[in-house]
Amino acid sequence: MPDENIFLFVPNLIGYARIVFAIISFYFMPCCPLTASSFYLLSGLLDAFDGHAARALNQGTRFGAMLDMLTDRCSTMCLLVNLALLYPGATLFFQISMSLDVASHWLHLHSSVVRGSESHKMIDLSGNPVLRIYYTSRPALFTLCAGNELFYCLLYLFHFSEGPLVGSVGLFRMGLWVTAPIALLKSLISVIHLITAARNMAALDAADRAKKK
């Protein structure tokens, strides 16, 4: 079999498209909320397709998994930076949210790699029950991730407009009410991510030290 070009696998090509759409979104964020949010959500929507393509074409790779996670983290972080500019009074909240998201996923990924997992989504079934559900139930994973991204996207749109009226309430405001609990739950799971990964790393350190004695 000739050498395969991992960088040109279909899921990775989708990943590159996600990055392009995200950059277009960031470019339009200061001036064109509907255009920016459309490209941002399109980038997020493609996240579901690259996973399906990887499984259907047997093209799952470590590079693809890393690309996927980094795109997710960087996209959310850039949106939160913009929100901090639009809502300066809530800057601390956005800073904490960014830090928690990046730190929890990075430490969880690193601990998974050190333990020998091929992906941060490969969960030891004897581990944390919340993370087990989060990573083994695709509906739960999709709902939490999509709801979290939609919350921040709606918060961005809400700065410019209430949105079309549904009765006497703007659509964007209504969407914020619905997605806020999901975003809060996602943040709590990030805390669990961080604590569980820290405990895993500490256990690995303890095991290594025991071997040296």
Swiss-Prot record:
Q: Quote a single Gene Ontology cellular component term.
A: plasma membrane
Locate the active site.
D72 (proton acceptor)
The known regulators of its activity are described as: Inhibited by PtdIns (product inhibition), phosphatidylinositol phosphate, and nucleoside di- and tri-phosphates.
Q: How does it sit in the membrane?
A: Multi-pass membrane protein
Question: Where can this protein be found?
Answer: Endoplasmic reticulum membrane; Cell membrane
Task: Name the domain of life this protein comes from.
Answer: Eukaryota
Annotated binding of a CDP-1,2-diacyl-sn-glycerol, by residue:
G51, R55, T61
Record GO terms (molecular function): alcohol binding; carbohydrate binding; CDP-diacylglycerol-inositol 3-phosphatidyltransferase activity; diacylglycerol binding; manganese ion binding
**Record note on cofactor:** Catalytic activity is higher with Mg(2+).
Asked whether the UniProt record includes Signal among its keywords, one would answer no
**Residue positions binding Mg(2+) 1:** D47, D50, D68
Q: EC number(s) in its UniProt entry?
A: 2.7.8.11
- Read off the Gene3D superfamilies from this record: 1.20.120.1760
User: Which positions bind Mg(2+) 2?
Assistant: D47, D68, D72
Describe tissue expression.
Detected in placenta (at protein level). Widely expressed. Higher expression in adult liver and skeletal muscle, slightly lower levels seen in pancreas, kidney, lung, placenta, brain, heart, leukocyte, colon, small intestine, ovary, testis, prostate, thymus and spleen. In fetus, expressed in kidney, liver, lung and brain.
Which residue spans belong to the Lumenal compartment?
Answer: 27, 95, 161-174
**PANTHER family recorded for this chain?**
CDP-DIACYLGLYCEROL--INOSITOL 3-PHOSPHATIDYLTRANSFERASE, PHOSPHATIDYLINOSITOL SYNTHASE
Q: What is this protein called?
A: CDP-diacylglycerol--inositol 3-phosphatidyltransferase
Protein species of origin: Homo sapiens
